[in-house]
Amino acid sequence: MIDFDPSYNFSQDRTFAFISEHPLIKEAGAEVGNPLIEGRLVQITENILAARGFTRVSKPEEADLAVGFTLGEREKIQVDSYPEFYRGGYGGWGWGGGYHGGYGGQSVDVRQYTEGVLSVDIYDPQERRPVWHGRATGRITKKMQENPEQVLEQVLGNIFATFPPSN
């Protein structure tokens, strides 16, 4: 999901900084098990913005834009139910054959999984107001946890796909 202030003119912006030395904010109650995530978010974001002509400066008050991140995860439960049918029919051996009735039932599958949420917020540091928001939500798998840098590159690439917006 992408949202931005249509009254803000992004075409004039050339520099960015991160909102603080530690720009990653964790959602309340969320645990970020890997302390390297913040550095990867910063480096990948810097690479993406540099490829689009932005230059990083050290202090947010000297930048055109200030970037921050919010990261969270939640345990979710998915419940799916499916109808089950046992069909009746004719059959039997010898003298006792005949019709057997069927019945309906339901099968329920319950799965627990972890959902991750990464938000990128960009502010106008002079006016101290948000001007752009990007968010990605998805199921976190064991395979993703094995290669977090590749996953973050893909997720941030998708979030920044239309940044800066043309208004």
Give names to the regions the model predicted.
Residues I25-K26, L41-T45, G91-W95, M144-P148, ...:
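Glycine-rich loops and low-complexity Gly/Arg-rich segments
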Residues I19-K76:
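N-terminal segment of the mature soluble domain
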Residues I2-L24:
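Post-signal peptide N-terminal segment of mature Sec-exported envelope proteins
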Residues L65, F69-R129:
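Surface-exposed short loop/turn segments
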Residues M1-S7, S107-N167:
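C-terminal/domain-edge helix-coil "capping" segments
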Residues F10-R14, R56-A63, I122-R129:
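A short, structured loop/turn motif at beta-sheet edges
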Residues P35-R40, F85-G92, R139-K142, L152-V155:
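Short, low-complexity, polar/charged sequence segments that are solvent-exposed and flexible
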